[in-house]
UniProtKB/Swiss-Prot annotation:
Record keywords, A-Z: Pyrimidine biosynthesis, Transferase
Family, per entry: Belongs to the aspartate/ornithine carbamoyltransferase superfamily. ATCase family.
InterPro entries: Asp/Orn_carbamoyltranf_P-bd, Asp/Orn_carbamoylTrfase, Asp/Orn_carbamoylTrfase_sf, Asp_carbamoyltransf, Asp_carbamoyltransf_Asp/Orn-bd
Protein name (Swiss-Prot/TrEMBL): Aspartate carbamoyltransferase catalytic subunit
Any one of the GO CC terms: cytosol
EC number per UniProt: 2.1.3.2
Catalytic reaction annotation: carbamoyl phosphate + L-aspartate = N-carbamoyl-L-aspartate + phosphate + H(+)
An annotated GO BP: amino acid metabolic process
Keyword Transferase recorded: yes
PANTHER family reported for this sequence: ASPARTATE CARBAMOYLTRANSFERASE (PTHR45753:SF6), ORNITHINE CARBAMOYLTRANSFERASE, MITOCHONDRIAL (PTHR45753)
């Protein structure tokens, strides 16, 4: 359990204390990653099934790595090699996999709400690895962990989220999590890529990039979600990059020296971020990847019923 939750589906559901429970445990899990032998017996005998209906590099590999470091058995499943191609429903697929008695189902799906639907029909814990444009809770948690690690705290800090906010499940999870930890959130991007009503979550909305990043402690750059966009919402990527992309000159002129830059990946280099910025000293993007393993270890440990404090060592 994570606090009162059997599942990890949306950070909208999580309290400040429940978010901190995960990222505090992730500190211990990250220590395991620094060891020469990266293996602990915490989840020995447990099974984690990864169901991915959408392409993924970081998230699927991260959950698989997290499970294996904790000594759980990990089964990776993709829709292209399953009976879904023969017309089997999502719920039937989940029920059949649950019959194999996994402890955790990790699911990524193009439809918002798919993980919650699965959770209503299975008895094991369900973790959302991203559902449509709804949420990506483990990414939101690893962003919280990374920011706290780099900034010391999120209390009183300002985070700018820039790009295609409307179609970003990462942005939604961050929006639900950051204010609970005391951070102020600024959203920036084309008006056509800004969802209505985000102000109710405590964010301020900007269309001017310089204004949005002025004085920010961290900037999270988002890619354009072409796969979720129907009619074009911007004139073109070149024009987008000129206005909302972050290059070395803008970073040097507009960001305060201590500001860090994050990106959930994959990066469209030369569009939202120039290579110089993505690979530069401000970038903590690869830290996010490593922290993602630690955070997902914490999630799996809490949901699968880890074997106690001694098993972490």
């Amino acid at each position: 359990m994570i606090g009162r939750h059997k599942h990890c589906i949306a950070l909208e559901d999580f309290s400040r204390e429940e978010i901190l429970e995960v990222i505090d445990l992730a500190v211990s899990m990250k220590e395991v990653l620094q060891r020469p032998i990266k293996k602990v017996p915490s989840l020995r005998g447990k099974m984690v099934v990864n169901l991915f209906f959408e392409a993924s590099t970081r998230t699927r590999s991260s959950f698989e790595t997290a499970a294996k470091i904790l000594s759980a058995d990990a089964l990776n499943w993709t829709s292209s090699s399953s009976s879904v191609t023969k017309g089997e429903t999502l719920v039937d697929t989940a029920k059949n996999l649950e019959a194999m008695r996994p402890d955790v189902l990790v699911i990524r799906h193009s439809a918002g709400g798919a993980p919650r639907l699965v959770a209503e029909h299975v008895g094991c814990s369900v973790v959302s690895a991203g559902d449509g444009a709804h949420e990506h809770p483990s990414q939101g948690l690893l962003d919280c962990f990374t920011l706290r690690e780099k900034l010391g705290t999120l209390e009183g800090k300002t985070v700018a989220i820039v790009g295609d906010v409307s179609h970003s499940r990462v942005a939604r999870s961050d929006l639900h999590a950051f204010p609970k930890l005391g951070a102020k959130v600024r959203l920036c991007g084309p008006p056509t890529m800004m969802p209505a009503g985000v102000e109710r979550l405590g964010a301020t909305v900007h269309t001017d990039l310089r204004e949005a990043v002025d004085g920010a402690d961290a900037v999270i750059m988002l890619r354009i979600q072409h796969e979720r966009i129907g009619d074009p919402l911007i004139p073109g990527t070149r024009e987008y990059s000129k206005v909302w992309g972050l290059n070395a000159k803008k970073a040097a002129d507009w960001l305060k020296p201590s500001c860090v830059i994050l990106h959930p990946g994959p990066i469209n280099r030369g569009v939202e971020l120039s290579p110089e910025v993505a690979d530069g000293p401000r970038s903590v993007i690869l830290d996010q990847v490593q922290n993602g393993v630690a955070v997902r270890m914490a999630i799996l440990y809490l949901l699968a019923g880890g074997a106690g404090e001694e098993a972490r060592a």
